Amino acid sequence: MSEYTTEADTVEDITESDEFTGTYTSESSTPATGGNSIIAPGGATGRRKEAVARVRIVPGTGKWTINGRELDNYFPNKVHQQLVNEPFRVTALEGSFDVIARIHGGGSSGQAGALRLGVARALNAIDLEANRPQLKKAGFLTRDPRATERKKAGLKKARKAPQFSKR
């Protein structure tokens, strides 16, 4: 009657098989040791308004690449440039990582906020003990929940009502 195999039977067959071992070791590779946080690359996602930024940081010289463009070209506004660089300034890691980011949606302010959150989350993932307290205190790990309020029927905008005439 058992024409079909259950998921549990398949899992048992795989775990009993000699093909699948728990760990893989190579004689040529060095054993992994936890340690220097500057060596590990990190990645994270940041969101703000309608913008989404996928961020990857790797050890380097502080070069920013956003959608294939430099930081100065992508964010010509100096306020936005300072905004996205704040997580590095707070953690005193300015110039020690290269940032590669893909951003879509939203406007320039939302994209800058999304990029800042993504960079902060990536720094947090690289070295939790060293970076998290500074980033948390500065408020960089908190996603800004504010979004555009929808327009309601019978109103001109989200809250603006047509002019009221008493008589």
UniProtKB/Swiss-Prot annotation:
- Cite the GO molecular-function annotations of the record: RNA binding; structural constituent of ribosome
Q: Where is the composition biased (Acidic residues)?
A: 9-19
* Composition bias type Basic and acidic residues, residue spans: 143-152
Q: Where is the composition biased (Polar residues)?
A: 20-36
Q: Which InterPro entries match?
A: Ribosomal_Su5_D2-typ_SF, Ribosomal_uS9, Ribosomal_uS9_bac/plastid, Ribosomal_uS9_CS, Ribsml_uS5_D2-typ_fold_subgr
Q: Which GO BP terms, alphabetically?
A: translation
PANTHER family assigned to the protein according to its UniProt record, in alphabetical order: RIBOSOMAL PROTEIN S9 (PTHR21569), SMALL RIBOSOMAL SUBUNIT PROTEIN US9M (PTHR21569:SF1)
What is the official name of this protein in its record? Small ribosomal subunit protein uS9
The gene that this protein is the product of is rpsI
